[in-house]
Structure formats: structure tokens, C-alpha cells
Amino acid sequence: MTFLRVVKNKAYFRRFQVKFRRRREGKTDYYARRRLVAQDKNKYDSPKYRLVVRLTNKRVICQIVSSTLVGDKVHASADSSELVHYGVKVGLTNYAAAYCTGLLLARRLLTKLKLDSQFVGKVEADGELYHVEEDDNERRPFKALLDVGIKNVTTGNRVFGALKGACDGGLHVPHSEKRFPGYSVDDENNGTYDAQAHRDRIFGTHVANYMEYLKEEDPEKYKKQFSAYLKLGLDSESLEDMYASAHENIRKNPVLPTKPKRKLKHVREGSKVLTSKGSYVRNVKITKAQRRERVKQKISLLVNES
């Protein structure tokens, strides 16, 4: 096969077609999105739901989304920053927090659809593979497909922690154990799954082990790195109880607490307007008579000076 150099002449630029904006920005993988969004033609107006998981530097975001012609519609959303209300006040980006966020999303969605009592899911997290569709239910469970975006998924990724939490919460998300922590392949290409290793990740045992190691090896670094834990009185022995109680609290009340509405406040002081959020400047529009009077005052002032 010969190498052909691309000649970027006038014809090349006339026929050049740019990619979609979000593809140019590296935000959307349209190859994967097309397969996640496309619905079977014999299902007509039935939406196809996606479990969207996104990881940032400070939080884990989980959403149940369906696509329409006018744009995506979010049916339920959960954020790891909400875990503060359920007892998890630190470590909001680790694997255990991702599991709690997925569990919160599942229980919140099923409560909204009034299916929370019908699809309880797995109450005790033990790391074992669980599919809600295998239970004896009167109706089919809520099904969603995992959407990881442009992230390169690897075994043990936090995305699959959110997936496990959503499945244990009662959602039907097709998956296998091959990407969970504890899955390994030997030299003969035979895979084995250690559910106990996955359970340790769900309850933050890996964080507790590192806390114990750092406390013995480098106490100064331990106090610096886990200062937020120490302020709350948390140590390596209390982490598992914290996450276990968070799972119970999420199941008791997964609904997002509403904030009280702030009273509107609009007070004008000259050209400054004071509101409940702050203040800003808005000049008052003067009338025609006021403008003429101001012109007369300027003329009289100039006459007096001359």
C-alpha cells in the first residue's frame, strides 16, 4: 500500500466537514452514544434509559437519562456531596462513596416511581453478583444501560462501584463481574471472582488499611493526609460502620431534602438595588421634565461662572 500525502488545496477545504462540537471538544463519544440511544423500531415511543456516571475531582455524579429529539431528559440524579446528609462527610470520591451514590440514585428513582417496596434489591452488601431480574417479581424491573462517557474503563474503576450500588438498590443494569474489584485472570486465561475483595472496597477497607499503614510508618503524613477524618473523630476501625449506617439511612429516606425558599428582597437606595443575594447598580431613568430642568441648571451655572 503506497503512502499518499494529503494535499490541502482549495478543493480539500471546500469539501471539509467538521466533526460535532462535543466531539471536537472531546466530551462525547458519538460512536458509543449512537448505540446507547438507538431504540428498537418495534418499541415505538418507549424510552431507552441510561445510567450516566461521571467522576470529577470532588464528587461522583450519577443520573438516569433518556434521549429525546429536543435533548436529553434527566429522570433522577444523585451526587456524592449529598452523602453528608446520610453520615458520610469525608472521602466523597472513593469507591465506597461511588457505591453509596449509585445506591442513592436507585432508591430515589424507585421511590419516585412508587416501586421502592416492590424492588428492594440487596439490603446487605456482600460483593456477590446480583441481578434483580432473577428475583420473583410481578413486573419487570427498571432497566438502564451503563454510560461511562469517554472514560477508559479498567477493572476496579469507581464507575463500576456506582453500577454495583445501583444494582443492589433495585435497578436492572446488564453487567458481569469481570470489571469488579476482586476479578482476576490466571495464566491459562481462566477468570475468578473474589466477592470478599469487592466487599472490602464497598466498605472502604482499603482506606482503613492505608490509614493503619501510614499511622505506623509516617505519623506526620498521616495527620496531614487524614486531617478531615481526624477532625470528625474517624479512625480505621470506624470506617466500615460509617458506610454501613449510610446504606441504612439511604434506604430509609432517599428523597432529596428541600431547602426553605428565601424571601425576596428588593430595596433601592439611589442607583443601588439591594436583594437577598447581594447588591447591584441600576441607574434610575429620568423623565423628560427632569432632563430639561437639569439642562437649565447647567446653563445657569455656566452663566454665573462667566
From Swiss-Prot:
Belongs to the universal ribosomal protein uL18 family. Component of the large ribosomal subunit (LSU). Its main location: cytoplasm. Component of the ribosome, a large ribonucleoprotein complex responsible for the synthesis of proteins in the cell. The small ribosomal subunit (SSU) binds messenger RNAs (mRNAs) and translates the encoded message by selecting cognate aminoacyl-transfer RNA (tRNA) molecules. The large subunit (LSU) contains the ribosomal catalytic site termed the peptidyl transferase center (PTC), which catalyzes the formation of peptide bonds, thereby polymerizing the amino acids delivered by tRNAs into a polypeptide chain. One of its GO terms (cellular component) is cytosolic large ribosomal subunit. It is found in: Cytoplasm; Nucleus. One of its GO terms (molecular function) is structural constituent of ribosome. This is Large ribosomal subunit protein uL18. GO terms for biological process: ribosomal large subunit assembly; translation. Keywords: Cytoplasm, Nucleus, Ribonucleoprotein, Ribosomal protein, RNA-binding, rRNA-binding. InterPro entries: Rbsml_uL18_euk, Ribosomal_uL18_C_euk.
